[in-house]
């Protein structure tokens, strides 16, 4: 089955692609697109190949192609979240979490490599630097938990596991700062639920405008 997504809206592309993924269990799929190609890992393997082609690389003339795909699916792959805790100077249950995922894409095929410097050695480097500073000077009223999450690239598995199996009551978590792709933050930080927590959002904006540099 050959499907062109050229000219489709973003919402349409998501719906069509979701349907094509389901169809890939019963037949081979070729998707024609002009979107930027990306690489990711999956929690399952398709029964048939799902191939994405650039419009310029596709010929509408009749013909056949032959491909040889080598893949290996690990049904039981173990990965672990890594935790560190710096207690507040005063006894408290209030906690701030600083997190970063430590897995990365690795490589695509035999020739394309993703060393992972930006995604996400940069986040882990920042996490360790913050831990080093806070270890010497802990916060007065907040515990700080540092979490290096596993299996983010496969669908946020490590962070989801932590939420479903928390090491502390989630009501005690006052704030979470996730460090990811720190080398290319030209557009700033992504703030989730900023409209629900306007006070905290405005505080972040105030701190950002001060342009405090780590020393």
Each predicted region: which residue ranges?
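Solvent-exposed loop/turn segments at secondary-structure junctions
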Residues: 8-10, 35-38, 90-91, 102-106, ...
């Amino acid at each position: 089955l050959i499907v062109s997504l050229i000219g489709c809206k973003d919402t349409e592309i998501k719906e069509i692609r979701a349907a094509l993924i389901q169809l890939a269990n019963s037949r081979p799929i070729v998707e024609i697109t002009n979107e930027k190609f990306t690489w990711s890992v999956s929690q399952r393997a398709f029964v048939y190949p799902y191939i994405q082609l650039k419009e310029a690389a596709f010929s509408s003339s009749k013909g056949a192609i032959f491909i040889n795909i080598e893949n290996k699916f690990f049904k039981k792959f173990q990965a672990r979240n890594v935790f560190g805790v710096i207690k507040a100077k005063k006894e408290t249950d209030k906690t701030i979490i600083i997190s970063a995922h430590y897995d990365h894409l690795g490589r695509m095929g035999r020739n394309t490599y993703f060393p992972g410097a930006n995604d996400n050695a940069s986040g882990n480097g920042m996490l360790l630097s913050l831990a080093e500073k806070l270890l010497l000077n802990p916060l007065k009223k907040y515990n700080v938990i540092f979490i290096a999450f596993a299996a983010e690239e496969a669908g946020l598995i490590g962070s989801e596991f932590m939420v479903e199996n928390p090491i502390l009551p989630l009501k005690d978590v006052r704030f979470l700062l996730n460090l990811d792709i720190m080398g290319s933050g030209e557009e700033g930080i992504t703030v989730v639920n900023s409209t629900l927590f306007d006070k905290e959002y405005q505080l972040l904006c105030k701190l950002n405008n001060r342009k405090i540099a780590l020393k």
